[in-house]
Amino acid sequence: MEALHKKIREEGIVLSDQVLKVDAFLNHQIDPALMKAIGDEFARLFADAGVTKIVTIEASGIAPAVMAGLNMGVPVIFARKHQSLTLTENLLSATVYSFTKQVESTVAISPRHLNSTDNVLIIDDFLANGKASQALISIIKQAGATVAGLGIVIEKSFQGGRAELDAQGYRVESLARVESLAGGVVTFK
């Protein structure tokens, strides 16, 4: 997606060979026009998938997921990282390790919102080592639902998450595939 590539080149900051900071438009400050275009693209890519719901993890996946949900006319569910007083029933949950934050957390979804008739599109801001995607897949399977595919805004192809998802037979559509961050330069695949 050229508009996303351009935004990454102009406003992304390479912090190391492993970390790309995109807080100017995706995961702190949000560019609504870009999010709309991202949602439109995910809707186009998965138009044939029979998606009934979209699942993401709070917080950075919410903006692109909502835009895709709006375009596709389906609800968006976000897995919560922190349990609240209103989230009390037997939860669908999984543990996920955040590469960026270097912490492990439990993410959860209420079983009221996800069931065996759902065909679920996972949308997330990044795909690195695939741990967040695997956690969401686990939650979807706990509900007896099916995974329609994964829509990733930015994939760090050099970190192996996609290879694992491909090996498991999941459809992965990434809007920007970063091959390398070496030398402080973003190289797209």
UniProtKB/Swiss-Prot annotation:
Entry annotated with the keyword Lipid metabolism: no
InterPro entries tied to this protein: PRibTrfase_dom, PRTase-like, Pur/Pyrimidine_PRTase, Xanthine_PRibTrfase
Known catalytic reactions: XMP + diphosphate = xanthine + 5-phospho-alpha-D-ribose 1-diphosphate
UniProt keyword terms in alphabetical order: Cytoplasm, Glycosyltransferase, Purine salvage, Transferase
Top-level EC class: transferase
GO MF entries: xanthine phosphoribosyltransferase activity
Top-level lineage group: Bacteria
GO biological process, one term: xanthine metabolic process
Record pathway: Purine metabolism; XMP biosynthesis via salvage pathway; XMP from xanthine: step 1/1
UniProt binding sites for 5-phospho-alpha-D-ribose 1-diphosphate: 128-132
UniProt binding sites for xanthine: 20, 27, 156
Record EC number: 2.4.2.22
A GO cellular-component term linked to this record: cytoplasm
UniProt cross-references to CDD domains, sorted A to Z: PRTases_typeI (cd06223)
Compartment(s): Cytoplasm
Quaternary structure (record): Homodimer.
Family label: Belongs to the purine/pyrimidine phosphoribosyltransferase family. Xpt subfamily.
Role noted for this protein: Converts the preformed base xanthine, a product of nucleic acid breakdown, to xanthosine 5'-monophosphate (XMP), so it can be reused for RNA or DNA synthesis.
PANTHER family: HYPOXANTHINE/GUANINE PHOSPHORIBOSYLTRANSFERASE, XANTHINE PHOSPHORIBOSYLTRANSFERASE
Name under which the protein is recorded: Xanthine phosphoribosyltransferase
Gene name per UniProt: xpt
